[in-house]
Amino acid sequence: MNEIAEVLPESMKNALSEIPEQQWLEIEEVRIRINRPVELIRRGQPVYLSYAGTAEDAHLILSRLSNYSMYTLEEELKKGYVTIRGGHRVGLAGRVITENGGVKGLRDIASFNIRIARQKLGIAEPLLPYLYQNSWLNTLIIGPPQTGKTTLLRDLARLSSTGKKNMLPVKTGIVDERSEIAGCLRGIPQHQFGQRIDVLDACPKAEGLMMMIRSMSPEVMIVDEIGRMEDTDALLEALHAGVSVIVSAHGWSISDLMKRPSLKRLWEERAFDRYLELSRAKGPGTVSQIYDKDGNVLSRTTGVKTC
């Protein structure tokens, strides 16, 4: 976790260094708050250190995130997060500055949430018989937060751009609005993909889908966390253009999807060939069920863990 250590104060690094290496592999988030104990999220559960964050810690972390020039973080402060080397995302919370009804930036930042990005190579391979049949099937991955949706999408992007035996690599476009799938730093993906990968980083999903089709002629597009009406419109346009799409959405089940006004149309038009439901039954990445385009169960996996 050298990339994370680079932005932390020495005293905090010393406190974190006491954690056994094996436990580090299970930590999903490091949450730092002024005047509160440092919180680690391990297997979805909070673990608190005796070390409490200070105002000086917050100032130093922010300085290191910005390379000691807050001007360079202007756009990131509007979005509320910064992506650092290694693809890790640092969420920020503090006093919001508004202008003309919109968010202009953040000040007095008192909370940091470092989401640890780990690429888990091969986790999507057990799903290939369901998701690839001579070509990639249009797929929606459904799950509540922290169930491994992004990790699974990342490996599917790797597989589609790399190929395997009897599966040729295809031109794969990632529209990465939150810089989480590819973890780009200055436009360069920090995770491992194949030769045929193109990324639109920090780009709104709906606009990015259309931009990618016009500029990069992808055969497969990967998008995380769809949910707005304009996302639905853009996805349908992509499908009509003959592009395969693999996307994710927040939800507990396929029935949740049918109830959401912004996504209901995708179900009604049978936009997807496959639906995957994820849970944390056996940890992040547990595939609970797989459905076909009509909602028929293809696999009751009883908790197959991919991640």
From Swiss-Prot:
GO terms for molecular function: ATP binding; ATP hydrolysis activity. It holds the Pfam family Spore_III_AA. ATP binds at G143, P144, P145, Q146, T147, G148, K149, T150. Keywords: ATP-binding, Nucleotide-binding, Sporulation. SMART domains: AAA (SM00382). Signal peptide: none annotated. It comes from the Bacteria. GO terms for biological process: sporulation resulting in formation of a cellular spore. This is Stage III sporulation protein AA. It comes from Bacillus subtilis (strain 168).
